[in-house]
Swiss-Prot record:
Superkingdom to which the source organism belongs: Eukaryota
Family: Belongs to the FARP (FMRFamide related peptide) family.
Keyword Transmembrane: no
One term of GO molecular function: toxin activity
Protein name (record): Conorfamide-As2
Species: Conus cancellatus (Cancellate cone)
Main location: secreted
Length: 12
């Protein structure tokens, strides 16, 4: 999901 860019980019 696109909730946090730090967890959504590296962890998608």
């Amino acid at each position: 999901r696109i909730r946090k860019p730090i967890f959504a980019f590296p962890r998608f």
